[in-house]
Amino acid sequence: MSNRIASDSVMTHTLLVMAGGTGGHVFPGLAVAQALKEQNWHIHWLGTAQRMEADLVPKAGFEISFIDIAGVRGNGLVRLLAAPFKIIKAVIQARGVIKQVKPDVVIGMGGFASGPGGVAAWLMGKPLVLHEQNAAPGMTNRLLARIANKVLTGFAGTFDAQKTADRQGQDVSDSAKYQWVGNPVRAGFATIMPKQISGISRATNVLILGGSLGAKALNENVPLALAKQNEIKVRHQCGKGHLDSVTQLYQNQLGDSGDWQVDEFVEDMPQAYQWADLVICRAGALTVAEVAASGVAAIFVPLPHAVDDHQTKNAQTLVEHEAGYLLAQNELVQGGLTSLLEACLAQPNMLVEMGNKARKLARLDAVQRVTHCCQLLVEKAQ
């Protein structure tokens, strides 16, 4: 199935982007796609019809095709036994898309479609690039890394093959298979101005981000902790389907006198980060990258059941450099956020210093590094 959007522009090369499921996969893919589109590349997307890419990708102006695939980890014995047949079917579907689109480069940014799509690209001899956003690589990318032409990572030392160079701060050559490029963020983050240490005489702006799908623990517990603080302004992104319940919770806790706003989705994320003095959030790879790029202090509450505990590992890349706080979800539920907030709000200059440390760890040119890799693969194939 394909949703095609016509274009009169002259295209030089074609990129097939495989990404979907959550904003952590889709938005980095869109950032790369937009950058290459501006260089006259034709962009086609491979995803699944039931996830957010089916809505976001056409809205961004890109063609998308769908394959039938879903996750297999933790889904019970029957689904596990059926998985090989579903994967084979999805690979065949992906081969059909590749045959139709004829991409010069295929890039997997994560999500269900990346596995079958990556195998199909390899079988058809197409240059395959992987981008692993998380500090702990997922099972699919660990397997696909063996057949990929390039493996790009959002964090240093994600794969064993790159640990030594990344630990020593080396920028490896273009010929290296494994390269630390950072996580692509939307173009608007480049315009965010660094915060200055001058003391915050106004109320402290607190931004709560539950991710593109929302976060139940943050939605239920953060308003309770914020109700005990003074001199704050609050913006809370609660995720689709949670607006009424979270709004009611703030109404009960802060009332009409409190300065708070609840939204299902934040359209202008760079503006929200620019506004914030402190962010309370999960620790998905994209969120950590956006926190660093924005130069804002953050309290990370990793999803406790994330595969391979990758969210904790993501957060630690900043926390280990005193560029963020780590709060386990069980500590959040037990009221640990209240005391941590009190300490943060009492030291506004410390928040600025923490944000500046985070910004120094960001790779603000991640999009350019990824697109450069795609260009090199095309040149090599010519």
UniProtKB/Swiss-Prot annotation:
This protein's GO CC annotations: plasma membrane
Record protein name field: UDP-N-acetylglucosamine--N-acetylmuramyl-(pentapeptide) pyrophosphoryl-undecaprenol N-acetylglucosamine transferase
Cystine crosslinks: none
Biological process, per Gene Ontology: carbohydrate metabolic process; cell division; cell wall organization; lipid glycosylation; peptidoglycan biosynthetic process; regulation of cell shape
E.C. number: 2.4.1.227
UniProt lineage: Bacteria, Pseudomonadati, Pseudomonadota, Gammaproteobacteria, Alteromonadales
Topology relative to the membrane: Peripheral membrane protein
Top-level enzyme category: transferase
Localization annotation: Cell inner membrane
Swiss-Prot/TrEMBL keywords: Cell cycle, Cell division, Cell inner membrane, Cell membrane, Cell shape, Cell wall biogenesis/degradation, Glycosyltransferase, Membrane, Peptidoglycan synthesis, Transferase
Membership in a protein family: Belongs to the glycosyltransferase 28 family. MurG subfamily.
